[in-house]
From Swiss-Prot:
InterPro entries: Ribosomal_Su5_D2-typ_SF, Ribosomal_uS5, Ribosomal_uS5_bac-type, Ribosomal_uS5_C, Ribosomal_uS5_N, Ribosomal_uS5_N_CS, Ribsml_uS5_D2-typ_fold_subgr. Coiled coil: none annotated. Part of the 30S ribosomal subunit. Contacts proteins S4 and S8. PROSITE patterns: RIBOSOMAL_S5, S5_DSRBD. One of its GO terms (biological process) is translation. The keyword NAD does not apply. HAMAP family: Ribosomal_uS5_B. With S4 and S12 plays an important role in translational accuracy. This is Small ribosomal subunit protein uS5. Keywords: Ribonucleoprotein, Ribosomal protein, RNA-binding, rRNA-binding. Residues 11-74 form the S5 DRBM domain. Belongs to the universal ribosomal protein uS5 family.
Length: 167
């Protein structure tokens, strides 16, 4: 996986969830915050980050920084997916399939944010099992990472793209 430095202005950033958590100590509770964010260039690059801090802005900033560092490339096909894909992380399972032009992003919550910043414009998606945002985001990114273009499959098998597509 190659890491390409991008200017912050070129990336779309989305905040998915902010959560207040507490640690109980002898003197009472210590509150801190967690933030889940996704960033993408709208053209097949996407990453997510999870930041924790005592203040909300600091948690968001940490999450954005981690997301920028952990970006992956997604092989898109004219604004949709190459083929139907499944992904899972702990109790969350996701299923995504390509859709025709004009369908839009039919996906819920955390999945929608990931697909929007990745540059997917037409997709049908469903999350099963746990809808915990962190696990849904991890499952979605795992599914997108597993997706292969016909060119990638052809290169791996040592065949032509026509042979792979059956033309």
């Amino acid at each position: 996986m190659s890491h390409i430095e991008k200017q912050a202005g070129e990336l779309q950033e989305k905040l998915i969830a902010v959560n207040r958590v507490s640690k109980t100590v002898k003197g009472g509770r210590i509150f801190s915050f967690t933030a889940l964010t996704v960033v993408g260039d709208g053209n097949g690059r996407v990453g997510f980050g999870y930041g924790k801090a005592r203040e909300v802005p600091a948690a968001i900033q940490k999450a954005m920084e981690k997301a920028r560092r952990a970006m992956i490339n997604v092989a898109l096909d004219n604004g949709t997916l190459q083929h139907p894909v499944k992904g899972a992380h702990t109790g969350s399972r996701v299923f995504m399939q390509p859709a025709s032009e004009g369908t839009g992003i039919i996906a819920g919550g955390a999945m929608r944010a990931v697909l929007e910043v990745a540059g997917v414009h037409n997709v049908l998606a469903k999350a099963y099992g746990s809808t915990n945002p962190i696990n849904v985001v991890r499952a979605t990114i795992a599914a997108l990472e597993d997706m292969k273009s016909p060119e990638m499959v052809a290169a791996k098998r040592g065949k032509s793209v026509e042979e792979i597509l059956g033309k």
